[in-house]
Amino acid sequence: MSDKILFLLTNDYTHYCLAYSLQKIYDCKMYAISEVTSRPKIFFQSQNLVNFENTWFFHDQIKKKSTNPDLDYLEKFEKKYKINLWKLVQNERIFLYFKNFYKFTSDEVLNILEQECRFFEKILEDIKPDYFFTRLPSLHHQELIYQMCRNTGIKTLAMNYTLLAKKCMISEGTKKLDYDKEFDSIKYQDRSFDEIQKYLQSFDLIKQLEEKLVKPGSSKLEKLESMGEYLLNFDSVNTETHYTYYGRTKRKVFFYYLNDYLKTKMRKSFIDKNLKLNSQFNDPFVYFPLHMEMERTTLIGAPYYVNQIEIIKNIAKSLPINFKLYIKEHPGQVNRGWRNKSEYKEIMDIPNVVLFHPDFPKDTLYKNCSIVFSIAGTASFEAACFGKPAITLIDLIHSILPSVHTLKNFNDLHDLINQLLIEKVDSKDVNRFLALFEKNVSNFDWSDFTKKLSDEFFSGKIQDIEISEEK
């Protein structure tokens, strides 16, 4: 009997391409849930390249409803699948950050959630898939079906970027490596910390993402042309059929992006004038790199630690009296229009905190700090590569490193910091982890592949476009 594979097709189309290749070498029945917008949907309705047994369009299942949500159903669903539903929806970026387009009521959120739950549950009960292929979830509905599959014994394979560039990981979970049995006994290359850092720099993921995943149409003239085409010629039903587009009238979109453009320029001016671009490092310090907002890492990966300013305050309260906390803005935050000036001011007003410019070299901070603190990102791994202990707030795949410590209670942070000040990081442990990590990843350059897809299909001025099978 053939295996049944359910694919979640997101807007980057990687998994559609994966399904196309897989059907040539593996005897299986394939099904798909597609998230595409209205215009690319036409292609998926008629395509013959992939022999899907059935394709469901996610947004066709979610309707505007004025009735009360069925809380009895949601309560039973939550217990059946062991999923904290409020945690999912209250950290959904569409509900949190875009209220200037549309402010969802509590009942609207729950009605959307109920329809998602019923839709996913029916698919899983009807086809009973053996495998679920997806990318690492970044939106609540993606995380919902991901958890449903994991909690019902469906083998779940999620594609994700890795700690190193030009590589890709397909794994069942997010907090540990699928293959981690040989950490203490694995053969490894015995490199010094300097050699490890050179290796790390050759696979700089942040640098690669900045270079390859910048959307086309980035010049001022091209952005103006895109806006002109959108306002004059673009017509879409997404505002009625996709709750992620609710309220996005042309007028609102125009003024939102005009306002965003102006705010970004003013915020960058504030950053250039007020955030530090140099330091003598006269004081010992703990280093905390800010996470990007909006980002999966915090919204889904660490949902109870979204408020980074409160975390900064808690770290600052826990430092030894002679220490400072050095904060660095994430260079990728420019893609979110930077942060409000009030947030930067609030951080800089904390007595023992210094806020650094996004252009300040992160390697300099790693080399000179005593400890690295990270909510859930790669900084704790990079800290180990620089011979520095690290503190995280959740378990991560590199928490297997002896120098990476997960904080369970902020009341313990002061003592943990003092403990780590005398801890030495062993380069052998870092080399062991890198050897083990290599066994869990492939050399598929996902960001490069995504860039090629974008250039081929979405190089025009509008992203919601029709695509053809001929391409």
Where in the sequence are the language-model features?
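Nucleotide-activated donor-dependent transferases that construct or modify glycoconjugates
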Residues: S2-D12, S34-V36, T105, F133, ...
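A donor-sugar binding/catalytic signature common to diverse glycosyltransferases
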Residues: T134-R135, N160, P358-H405
